[in-house]
Curated annotation (Swiss-Prot):
Domain of life assignment: Bacteria
Keywords: Aminotransferase, Cytoplasm, Glutamine amidotransferase, Repeat, Transferase
Subunit comment: Homodimer.
Locations listed in the record: Cytoplasm
Name of protein: Glutamine--fructose-6-phosphate aminotransferase [isomerizing]
PROSITE patterns the record matches: GATASE_TYPE_2, SIS
Ranges where the Glutamine amidotransferase type-2 domain occurs: 2-217
Function as written in the Swiss-Prot or TrEMBL entry: Catalyzes the first step in hexosamine metabolism, converting fructose-6P into glucosamine-6P using glutamine as a nitrogen source.
Gene3D superfamilies named in the record: Glucose-6-phosphate isomerase like protein, domain 1, Glutamine Phosphoribosylpyrophosphate, subunit 1, domain 1
Active site feature: C2, K604
Amino acid sequence: MCGIVGAIAGRDVVPVLIEGLKRLEYRGYDSSGIAVLDGAQVRRVRRTGRVAEMAQAAQAEQLGATLGIGHTRWATHGGVTEANAHPHISAGVALVHNGIIENHEAQREKLRALGYTFESQTDTEVIAHLIHHHLGSAGDLLTALQHTVKELTGAYALAVVSQAEPERFVCARMGCPLLIGVGEGENFVASDVSAIVQATRQVIFLEEGDTAELRRDGVRIFDGNDAPVERPLHLSDVSLASLELGPFRHFMQKEIHEQPRALADTIEAAIDAKGFPASLFGANAEAVLRDIEGVQILACGTSYYAGMTARYWIEAIAGLPCSVEIASEYRYRAAYANPKHLIVTISQSGETLDTMEALKYAKSLGHLHTLSICNVPESAIPRASELVCYTRAGAEIGVASTKAFTTQLAVLFQLTMVLGTLQGRISDAEEAEYLEQLRFLPGSVQHALNLEPQIMAWAERFSPKENALFLGRGLHYPIALEGALKLKEISYIHAEAYPAGELKHGPLALVDAAMPVVVIAPNDRLLEKVKSNMQEVRARGGELFVFADQDSHFSDSEGVHVIRTPRHAGVLSPVIHTIPVQLLAYHTALARGTDVDKPRNLAKSVTVE
């Protein structure tokens, strides 16, 4: 992995490829490259480091062509070297690849026996040689690709050019996202619409097992059986403006500040309906949701913490049992399946491989009803789900998720309301009260954003630290986990989170004067318990940084620093308390001088295991 772009046009496509790769930088990468068909010759430029360095090299070599492919690589097989960077070439065939080929060693040995030699450590070079091998018998590039993919085990998105066929290039998809952009006399392929939005907003999403041929004047798509197939054309709502920084220093900062609008857009349908109709989740949602007897949530990373928060809501308000599992664990265990339990998958991109595979596994076990919560329309997970609700967060570029998380919480709260209503657990008066809380949520988030100057001062104290501890209880324990994740992701400070009640069962051994302890302390029924836990920290010399509600009775004292969030927002308080931990992570990373939007070793869309 991590990003693919390709183009065929009546103009020089090198600027399109370079711009596309720059727009894919947010996904995370460590090297990049392009290959173009210049006359009857494949010319290639690859570099480790930033796309800008590769672009300078391409300019120096005066690369120009009407057909080409490009790639940003995040190392999986083989280290970060120019030899391992894509595109890979076998004779006159050049290829870029996202994904992991699980049987690459067996294929490598077979190819060596046929006389092929390898210049890299990657699984991708195996595919290039296989395509070249099949060209001899297949006679054309598309057929060679179709023969090749049938020999591959694993996940892939591929784009391939051949010097023998200058009028077209081909692509394939299995387990990794890939789309086609349709233009006027030009066509494109990309792993993400942001890579081609400067050229076209008309896109076709390839399905699992699809292969395709792209020419200047048209596109042909074939299914997994190599039969011609039509796929629908969509108009993407991603705009160039959403991919620009504007007045902000980083995309993460921009996206933190976009949360009031993102939340308002996400809850708009419920506000307009003056309630929580099941139709928020699909035309047949009422019939599906009325009969379920429990909920099982599958997700990874930040989305998993959103699911953890929802478990408190679903069990307390809707009165249904709810379990939350890390998708990569669930898919490999002998799980118990209750067909009456709703499977909910959460993924910002809608393409997270572990979550997609967990969904497939749940279906194979006999789960009848599935619902996905995603931010990207027409992505793989929604297409594989019975019901779907899209967060309306807009494009999220920063690797560390912010507005996707809070809008996921907003959707999960609405799901709780729908389930509670259908289960007869919520009265009309209670529904009206919850709706009012939801209505005020964007404004409360804006008030929390106004705490930024105070949090910046805290960040200066955090920046020299090497470790941090986050504590929360009940609904706010998942927010403590999210705060710790954000801090470690972008500042590289080792941070852990625990339920505050677990302090005495181990984590208290870590507390000393050098350990900052962040406490989420809303004015709820567990506040006095949290205060007792805070005393345990102070007694060991730990320094406390407390996020408390306006109506919580806290004050600064020696070793205790307090920032007051807006007045307690009831069951939606976790959304409010997310904002300050995001800001703390952002400004601490800023103070430490890290690359906020592209943290080391991380990718935005995790489309491999």
